[in-house]
């Protein structure tokens, strides 16, 4: 029983104690919005996957470029072939350059090859593949920017969500203080015979309601801090403070500036365009399957019965050779035609995706700008509402103290002020999030 009473007392006192604990608990260095974004980029796995994809695409571009350049290898080989028996002499020869061998493809029983080989293949498919890899690398880079902007938008929402939650805690705490003050006034007036006991009961109910609201606000603030802490620290429960407030809102750029930035710096459109370019080059590469490839080879080294620069008779084994090969495609059972068909279908799909991406950009741009504009306008109205509600509460308290107002009027004024202050904090977050979402289309991110 004693334990249950202690737990109940802790719950009742939890709101104010949590606020004091937040004010007095040691915390890490203040974190700005830019620092929060930087930390999130080192932890968030989706962004890390986009970084990996971009790096891999850049490496693939280098591989495709290397395929266009001559390749050099140092080839070393030893061949042993069974010798051919000579009539009248059952002992096969094992060494001379004129020894007969059983496999006509080989030159002698012992053959040593040590050569530097330079190989170059000239074909349109290789050039198209390189340009395609370049387009895919550009598309991966654009997708990385999409992921970065999405992460920034998430961090901005969570960052200002924490600020709004802290503001709601402050509002709930002030409301509790006001409710306690009003309860004290009602009890004093009841003792003086000025009001009925019903006013005291109503004031007590109001105080209890404010205590519950403070407890809920503290819990919501704790959850908001943990949600942001997941993106900032290995331990999400690490204490921290934020450097930005909700008092000074950044200005909203003009619609003309937004339109220009969105057309020139939108990663979604850029990624879709690069995907289309890659698909177009894939068609070109597939069509080069109908065109011959020219291979050039140059050899320098030895191909001799001895592993030596000079033969036993003093002649030099070192020498060079060159070859040119032209492979003309004749018949491949329609494999090339099917590859062209596949790539053409993918190109058509890429064109459709680019078109719908451009349409979505126009629609999202208008929608998000209107959201940010309305949010900015409402912030001025919310500021006026807070001032009006605060003035109304002061006047109502004076009327009640003078015996001209009722307890219900005071309670209603208190509720109006709390609602206005909470709405202002939520309105500030709404504007920041709307501005961040708009900036994801224009590239003007922190």
Can you name each region flagged by the protein language model?
Residues 6-15:
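Bacterial N-terminal signal peptides
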Residues 38-48, 55-71, 115-132, 142-149, ...:
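A glycine-/polar-enriched beta->alpha junction
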Residues 23-29, 75-122, 241-255, 280, ...:
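Small/polar, glycine/serine/threonine/aspartate-rich low-complexity segments that form flexible
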Residues 150-263, 371, 375, 416-417, ...:
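Periplasmic alpha-helical coiled-coil/stalk elements that build and connect Gram-negative outer-membrane
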């Amino acid at each position: 029983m004693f334990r249950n009473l202690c737990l109940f007392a802790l719950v009742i006192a939890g709101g104010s104690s949590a606020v004091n604990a937040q004010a007095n608990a040691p915390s890490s260095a203040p974190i700005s919005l830019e620092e929060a974004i930087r930390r999130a980029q080192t932890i968030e796995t989706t962004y890390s996957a986009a970084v990996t994809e971009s790096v891999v695409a850049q490496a693939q571009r280098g591989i495709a470029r290397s395929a266009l350049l001559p390749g050099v290898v140092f080839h070393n080989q030893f061949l042993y072939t069974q010798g051919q028996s000579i009539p009248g002499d059952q002992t096969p020869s094992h060494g001379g350059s004129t020894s007969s061998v059983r496999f006509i493809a080989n030159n002698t029983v012992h053959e040593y090859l040590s050569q530097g080989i330079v190989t170059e293949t000239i074909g349109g498919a290789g050039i198209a593949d390189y340009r395609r890899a370049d387009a895919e690398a550009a598309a991966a880079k654009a997708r990385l920017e999409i992921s970065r902007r999405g992460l920034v938008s998430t961090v901005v929402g969570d960052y200002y969500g924490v600020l709004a939650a802290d503001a709601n805690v402050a509002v709930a705490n002030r409301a509790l203080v006001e409710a306690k003050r009003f309860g004290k006034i009602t009890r004093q007036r009841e003792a003086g015979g000025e009001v009925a006991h019903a006013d005291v009961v109503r004031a007590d109910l109001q105080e209890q309601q404010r205590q519950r609201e403070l407890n809920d606000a503290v819990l919501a603030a704790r959850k908001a801090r943990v949600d942001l802490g997941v993106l900032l620290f290995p331990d999400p429960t690490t204490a921290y403070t934020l450097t930005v407030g909700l008092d000074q809102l950044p200005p909203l750029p003009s619609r003309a500036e937004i339109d220009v930035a969105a057309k020139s710096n939108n990663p979604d459109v850029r990624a879709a365009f690069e995907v289309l370019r890659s698909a177009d080059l894939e068609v070109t590469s597939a069509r080069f399957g109908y065109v011959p490839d020219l291979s050039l080879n140059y050899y320098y080294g030895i191909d001799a019965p001895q592993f030596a620069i000079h033969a036993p008779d003093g002649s030099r084994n070192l020498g060079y050779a060159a070859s040119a090969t032209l492979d003309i495609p004749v018949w491949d059972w329609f494999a090339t035609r099917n590859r062209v068909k596949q790539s053409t279908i993918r190109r058509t799909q890429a064109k459709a995706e680019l078109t719908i991406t451009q349409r979505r950009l126009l629609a999202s741009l208008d929608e998000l700008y209107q959201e940010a504009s309305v949010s900015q306008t409402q912030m001025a109205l919310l500021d006026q509402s807070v001032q009006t509600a605060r003035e109304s509460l002061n006047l109502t308290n004076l009327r009640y103290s003078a015996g001209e107002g009722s307890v219900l009027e005071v309670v209603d004024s208190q509720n109006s002020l709390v609602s206005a202050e909470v709405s202002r904090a939520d309105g500030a977050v709404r504007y920041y999030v709307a501005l961040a979402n708009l900036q994801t289309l224009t590239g003007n991110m922190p």
